[in-house]
Amino acid sequence: MGKIIGIDLGTTNSCVAVLEGGEPTVIPNAEGNRTTPSVVAYTKKGERIVGEPAKRQAITNPDQTIRSIKRHMGTDHKVTLNDKEYTPQEISAMILQKLKRDAEEYLGEEVNEAVITVPAYFTDSQRQATKDAGRIAGLEVKRIINEPTAAALAYGLDKEGDKTILVFDLGGGTFDVSLLEIGDGVFEVVATSGNNHLGGDDFDKRIIDYLAENFKKEYGVDLRDDRMALQRLKDAAEKAKKELSSVKTTNINLPFITQTEDGPKHLDIDLTRAKFNELTEDLVEKTMGPTRQALKDAGLEPGDIDEVILVGGSTRIPAVQEAVKDFIGKAPHKGINPDEVVAMGAAIQAGVLAGDVDDIVLLDVTPLSLGIETLGGVFTKLIERNTTIPTSKKKVFTTAADNQTSVDIHVLQGERKLAKDNVTLGRFQLTGIPPAPRGVPQIEVKFDIDANGIVHVSAKDLGTGKKQQITIKSSSGLSEDEIEKMVNDARKHEEEDKKRLEEIEARNEADSLVYQTEKTLKESGDKVSKDVKDKVEKAKDELKKALEGDDVDQIKEKTEALKNELTELSSQLYAQAQQQAQQQAQGQQGAQTDNQTGQNDGKTIDVDYEEVDDDDK
């Protein structure tokens, strides 16, 4: 069986890991980095690029670059790239394909299965959309798990004793807080809360607005109206935010940011950490509400927490760390990388599913209450939030009118009292109920939540046994046919990418061979026969001509032909070199013999000597 990889599909960055020798290992991407920007773009030539290359060209190509698509998962939002509309699932699938490819390169084998993480506060439709994205990317999603839970898995893998931990997860676009009890290999989530629209992007936006307003006051130009200038502001804001985590002040310098009648204008502003804290104070405070709620739901006080784990790049912001420390009363744990820990936890869960890890039990919860709309537009809960999953609950309802032969089941998720204030997950109808006075028919509604947190609902007329059921689909409304089409499109793109890579490699090899051939011909002089040189020259010219066209097979064929001709040329060069070496060796041997002979040419050598008497001795 192939490896199951663990993927943290993030708003700003994504990460992939695998279990090796019982330990989670982060897989570096093709660019050599441990995280991959969640950015997709199309170049001016119509080539799709993902990750670091896409992020690098965003300033010069903002209209064809998509970031932070995770914020739109589970909605009917569409983006246009290269004159084509894409759903958030398709854009996410492109990021997943890149991670899949990098994992395959690292492992040296095909990867078809994955565990993907989502924010704990993701709704059913957002989870379903994530699963669809995996499928479009060619991955069977074995499990969807919550990001804070994954982080706890990575943290608690080698910990002894019972602990209560709080996972504070502030990513690029979402915020979650979860409370877990860890002990004897059991990871039990006791409460979770969060905000699906709060993250690092919001902190960046405060800096962007601050810079833009200052510039507008000085020059009367709003940089936010210019797509290219706005992209430069975004990059500068993100960089400044990161720098202010380690220094007290940073300089934001963007020369030639725009052009007015008076000439080019430059942006040059110093931003202090104190000013940044002032701009984002309310955002930091927004993280405290869900934190208090999670503690309240779990029936715990701040003093009951043994350890605080920070997850997500935005938790590097000093004001965030300070707020957590002040509220809980202890400094957060710093021994884990907040950008990688979620993917590592996903890899551990993948190991559990593959049977490679057998001493871990994960008990997760549903983040929001589930129920149906009843008479008067009331939201009637069947499953309360923070219920351990998988779970199943049923409740008997009845008709609201005489002789009612069908009932509409309106499935909802949320915490508000009225149905209209909660999130609609789906609707279906149970028909064929025998006419009867209101209150007589008995309709049993059953909710099942699987281990992925995905909801299945059924309604049954207890009188007739008639049953109707629904698996809640993403509210983006993707049908099975649409998903299948997207899978095929993604596969086609994958094949196109492989072909493009093959073409690049073939061209690079051919270019290199042409250069090497020209160099060899120049250096060989008259060491090889004219006939062989002419053949090599002809093969080289044919390859150069093939390189001017787009036929990859032709390039490969002409490359091989030139290689064959070069073999003959090389053979002659080696033979020539060998012959010269032998002649040189023979010449040296002859010279040595002459020297030895010359040392005794028959002449008498006179030697002076002195005779010594014995007495002088």
From Swiss-Prot:
Keyword Cytoplasm appears in the UniProt entry: no
Start-end of Polar residues biased regions: 593-602
Low complexity: compositionally biased ranges: 575-592
Biological role: Acts as a chaperone.
Annotated spans, Disordered: 575-617
Family: Belongs to the heat shock protein 70 family.
Conditions for induction: By stress conditions e.g. heat shock.
Family matches, as HAMAP family: DnaK (MF_00332)
Name the UniProt record assigns to this protein: Chaperone protein DnaK
Classification via Pfam families: HSP70
PROSITE patterns listed in its UniProt record: HSP70_1, HSP70_2, HSP70_3
Modification Phosphothreonine occurs at: T174
PANTHER family, per the entry: HEAT SHOCK PROTEIN 70KDA
Ribonucleoprotein as UniProt keyword: no
InterPro entries cross-referenced by the UniProt entry: ATPase_NBD, Chaperone_DnaK, Heat_shock_70_CS, HSP70_C_sf, HSP70_peptide-bd_sf, Hsp_70_fam
Gene Ontology molecular function, alphabetical: ATP binding; ATP-dependent protein folding chaperone; unfolded protein binding
Compositional bias (Acidic residues): 607-617
CDD domains on file: ASKHA_NBD_HSP70_DnaK-like
Keywords for the protein's UniProt record, in alphabetical order: ATP-binding, Chaperone, Nucleotide-binding, Phosphoprotein, Stress response
